[in-house]
Amino acid sequence: MARSVPPADTSATPLSPPSKPVALQALSTNTLGAWAGGSFSTGDLIGNIQRAQMGLVGLRYHRLLIPSPSKTETGGPTLTYTVDMFPVLLLSIPPNTVAPPPARKEPGPEESSVYQEGMDAYGFGVGPAGLRLTSRVAKRVQPFVGGSTGLSYFSQPIPNGLGRHLNFMFGVGAGVQIVLTSDLILTAGYRYYHLSNGFRGQINPGIDANLLHLGVAMSQ
């Protein structure tokens, strides 16, 4: 006599939702980071002082604007607002790069020393208005483009006594951010920086810097 087989349990076992990629886990509304950069050459799009060198250390806050973290399952582009604090700004101008004062004007000590000897200045600044557009946010390697603008204050007038301590600065650039863990992100990129007093001084030659930067960020 055949043994009866108990009916199979047809109740469906709920499946656990697939886990998000690490890159999406790292995507957060708020992110804090630190970065540093240095120039490898000067440009001449706007600024006129050549062979100047610029270095900086920055602290950055990121605020995700579009879309929210819950709506990025497809890995589409995101728009982020950034704020930078620069506790360290370094600027070096070599000799014979700032045009001397007109022959009819007697140069002051600060003007002549910069023209003959160059100058090194130290300062700090803030970049309260920045935007970054990042793509492929579901991947570990994510390209981005961005820009920011702000103010800087130096230990002496830039580029000499005819300039100003307070200067405007803005930069645009591109790079990649690499998601190392769900909490840690590495960034590397290039930025074109411009620094000038906005025609508030007696002279305003301006400085353009091609800058490479490296940083880390922590998701909150």
Where are these regions (language model features)?
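Flexible, solvent-exposed loop segments that connect beta-strands
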Residues: 46-48, 91-119, 156-162, 200-203
